[in-house]
């Protein structure tokens, strides 16, 4: 049986009959990961402590309900944390977390190109969309790192390895939108993750981007992320490292 399989595979490499499916490749990939997302939702939704599924209409302000739940559940108001946000944009979420955490020893790091998306996203947004100025916050605990994550994160992690390897809880906010940026960032952060760290995804249910990156990260690194809270039909989703 194995010989037959190998023969057929090699034959298809020589006679590329599968090219007839090439125009539908993107659709097949989307359906594959969308079904993976559906399966994940139906098997994991019961594990969430807070979840609004199913909501017929998404509401932007629901993300703050998610933040508020995470803040209260983990008692983060006065806890020292290291907050890392990937995809700052105008800084709305970044500002929310810096304002709601009162510990003066906390540190807040925001990563973004501030020049918009580095590539097209989701069929609706083009390269360069969502550009913004670097936010100006009156808080000396905050620092913004401008540039592609692929260019800035490795150096940052090397220079701050002691801080990130400490027992201080890390709150990681993934708002990069793109698969490429999310997958890269999670892989680089893996050595620094410890039990109790929190990871938020801002576009989790986008099947070919943040969800795909999450799925590959948990499978490839054998890491367990405990579901905590979700709003807007899992568009914004929070996990804790187990």
What is the meaning of each model-derived region?
Residues 1-57:
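Membrane-proximal basic amphipathic "stem/tether" segments
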